């Protein structure tokens, strides 16, 4: 019983790391992490919610409600035609990440559906992925907007003095993605538009952005040019910024009426 109490204590909407009021998930500061740490959180919580359902150790209703909020107001929005939005994934955006993370999230939602029949119809709609719902949602805690129409999907990822940009060059993941949360806008129809694209992108010319043509130098090139970090070490890549630091602009945000929205 004590162990279950410890597990479920994390299932609450909070201002710090974890589930946010807007349905997003933060980790490593005020940073959108639905496809990385948030996905692991969803998988673990859905698993234990299903295992313990119908027993004296079942999750309290308010804890299940927090998990339901994360799914219906978060994950439901960022999966399109079986693909996870790259902009919501965090730093793990490598090969097959969109389909792999979408499958993992949908499996977790299927487990939650068994434990939370009260919202079974809504979970079933997410799992079908054939008749995507429409609407607009601004994730105000995360500087992120999603717009869904019957035949296409669009999203914008931003950062401000209130949020942390997507982390880069951590465990060699997203090594070139310094600007990936600087106003990038992605549009999907089939869902395959960005499949395995990260190895081919010019990371100083990302869609939706106006970026400086900053040269990207490898570790070998940095060594030859004697470029050093503040610590004195040779950088692995030059196109990087210290993670867990908030953005620099206050003029970032969005408005939404649930159908239409605007982001800047």
Predicted regions and their residues:
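Active-site lining segments of carbohydrate-active enzymes
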Residues: 1-58
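Extended polysaccharide-engagement surfaces of secreted carbohydrate-active enzymes
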Residues: 41, 48-264
